[in-house]
Regions:
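Active-site loop immediately N-terminal to the catalytic Tyr-X3-Lys motif
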Residues: 102, 153-159
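C-terminal helical subdomain
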Residues: 188, 204-239
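Conserved glycine-rich cofactor-binding loop
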Residues: 21-22
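Residue(s) in the substrate-gating loop at a strand-loop-helix junction
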Residues: 148
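Substrate-binding pocket helix/loop in short-chain dehydrogenase/reductase
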Residues: 100-113
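Active-site helix of classical SDR
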Residues: 124, 164
């Protein structure tokens, strides 16, 4: 069952990817540009964005930090002026550092929240009025938040990352309930392990590891089907979904057995 309008034709559509300098965001920008979209890429690393824009004619580099709410408001105003419509916005910005309770650091934990969750709130503050205006004019739009399977339930070494992603998933669910009746699409993406700069420092085995290009294709397929939740690879994520419904006595035992921690 489709929960969103199906996004199957990208030709001429304006797509803003926030967090597009590397990893999934960069691969998604490349795939959407190849599908004919007018891609706008944002992240902190201006040089990488300009390199992308130079190599992909018709795309736009818009450097910013998701922790800077005024910068996001300025970016939306600029896009409204230059592109008119924002057909889709994908929040891919993320920060990850493995953390267990024995190595807890307040500054690092707060940094996870500021980028992974508050960054999304800053985006909403800037973007929602524009999307609602588009909806009232019958033009619609789509907002997608990239969360993680680490947000399903607590996993070892995800003491800072997991709670921030769980909050992002909850936010997407709330947004869908409010915005779907307005004619706006909302989706949440739960990737498993993807070979990105964020996961490169992991010192443990990452099962069912995907390339960023494979992750981007899974997202495009999910939007084309009108899904609310897009999770991949299913051979890994379905097991985590099963863990999510187990009682705590079985859940903790299963996680310890699977991870050895």
């Amino acid at each position: 069952m489709s929960l969103n309008p199906k996004l199957q034709h990208w030709q001429g559509k304006t797509v803003w990817i926030v967090g597009a300098s590397s990893g999934i965001g960069r691969a998604l920008a490349e795939a959407l540009h190849g599908a004919g979209a007018r891609v706008v890429v944002s992240a902190r690393q201006a040089a990488l964005l300009l390199e992308f824009a130079h190599a992909h004619p018709g795309s736009t580099a818009l450097p910013l930090d998701v922790q800077d709410a005024p910068a996001l408001r300025s970016a939306v105003a600029q896009l409204q002026s230059s592109h008119g419509q924002i057909d889709a916005c994908i929040f891919c910005a993320g920060h990850y550092q493995a953390m267990r309770a024995q190595q807890f650091g307040l500054d690092e934990a707060v940094r996870h929240l500021q980028i992974n969750y508050v960054g999304a709130l800053n985006l909403l503050d800037a973007l929602l009025p524009q999307l609602l205006r588009q909806a009232q004019a019958g033009r619609g739009g789509h907002l997608s938040l990239v969360s993680s399977v680490a947000g399903y339930r607590a996993l070892p070494k995800s003491m800072a990352y997991g709670p921030a992603k769980a909050a992002l998933t909850h936010l997407a669910e709330a947004l869908y309930q409010d915005l779907s009746p307005e004619g706006l699409g909302v989706s949440v993406v739960h990737p498993g392990f993807v070979a990105t700069p964020l996961t490169a420092g992991n010192d443990f085995h990452m099962p069912a590891l995907l390339s960023p290009a494979e992750a981007a294709q899974a997202m495009l397929d999910g939007w084309a089907d009108g899904r609310f939740e897009i999770h991949f690879p299913k051979r890994f994520t379905l097991w985590l979904k099963l863990l999510r419904i187990l009682p705590y006595s079985l859940y903790f035992r299963a996680v310890r057995r699977a991870t050895g921690l």
